Amino acid sequence: MRMWAQSHLCQKPQRVNSVLAAAFALAFLILSASQSASALPAFARKYGLRCSACHESWPMLNYFGQKFKDNGYQLMNDRDSPIWQNPGYWPVTFRILPIWHRVSKGKQVVDSGGGQVEQRITSSGFDLSGLDFHTGGTLEKNISFYVLPSSDATASFHFETVMTRLDNVFGSTWLNVKLGKFELDNLLSEKRILTLTANGGIYQLYHFMPVGDGNIFGQIGSNQLGVEVMGHSYNDRTRYSAALLSSNNGSVGLPYGANSYSGFFAASQAFDTGKLGVQRLGFYAMVGEAPTTWLTNGGAPIGGSGTGNKTFSREGFVGQFYFGQHFDVQVVTQHGSDSAWFGQGYGDLIDGIATLNNTPGTVLPATARAPAWNGVLIEPHYIYSPQLIFLARYETIRMSQQANVGQRSDLGNITTYTVGYRYNPFMTSRAGFAWHNEFNLFHQVGTSTLSNTNINTSEVLTGFDFDF
């Protein structure tokens, strides 16, 4: 889930340098009075572990935290069953942020005396994030659950995660079965992302759609509805997962296809490099089909009636590289492609993302092509201490084939840069608190409404990220 959600209303602020300089100076003043780190809520309260045992910086997991998650939120000892818990233990964590941010976006369409023009819009002020309400753990040993009601800043709730998992089926770590709505098995988890701005608070690779494309169903950053089989070696060095998903982008109520499914597959191998740490390499692939043809009533599409399935795919590699105790780099690559039907604007007609209905007899124009793209994400972290982490991210996505012959080859290309840090003055088994500071710059080619020129957006954000 994105802790902060909004439209991409950003552009480079004029006083960003001075704001960031003041923030960094204050960070080092506070650092001089730092305390030792302790534990995080919910699971920390259950097992009495330091939170740094599972997290590089909460909510991002380290190697041990990933193993704990893969084991179904268990340490694989006789205390995993709820019967060993204190009757007063309540496995719940709330998370929310009060923030200040400055957002600016150029080339927005506004009315003027002579018609419409493009103009920069900039705003700043105090705000709130959404609210996450986490609860999870074990119903019995080797039967795990996780429920996450989540809201936006106006307290409009939905279920981000609802899942139950059978762990260690037949006594083997190689067979675990999960059913419900859950995050896909992304090693670089967007749900545990450290950044919070509108464009920096998501991984663009996980949600990219070419300009004019009608396919919302290939977003690997969205929690999906389905069933997953996952397994791992006892030490978690070798991992695999395979999921069968409804092609509905995690939406409930069967709103889209009458019979459309997707699959997500991932595997990885970790290896020890001595003092450098445990490195991991892996791959992932999402392949599926989604509807382009809809029954209508009075011209409006009927939910659940979608047929005329067309294909899409996303595949790539993941690397997690550690260089001692203080520095690591996460890398993700992706090649994506959609059917030419999606590229022409067919697909999600229910939500208005697509504009065309593939009715019987429809033929694509001769200039139509299957859109394809390549992208890379590089995210380094410097962990000064368990209480202070500096981070950066560079993402770029480049179209390798546009949906139509004659379109400019770089239309819709994205480049984004994010830098920030998080300082935790304390972390206990009852609560967590982080002073969060971040700057994001986002650039997309040729997508302004009137002039079809480039859009540059930016956001600077500071706030108190806390859970309890």
Functional labels for PLM-detected ranges:
Residues 62, 93-103, 109-111, 118-250, ...:
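Outer membrane beta-barrel
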Residues 77-96:
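Short Fe-S-cluster ligation motifs
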Residues 1-16:
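N-terminal secretory signal peptides that target proteins for export/translocation
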Residues 40-50:
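Sequence/structural segment immediately N-terminal to covalent heme-attachment motifs in c-type
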Residues 48-58:
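The canonical Cys-X-X-Cys-His
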Residues 162-166, 170, 275-468:
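Outer-membrane beta-barrel pore domains
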Residues 28-37:
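C-terminal segment of classical bacterial N-terminal signal peptides
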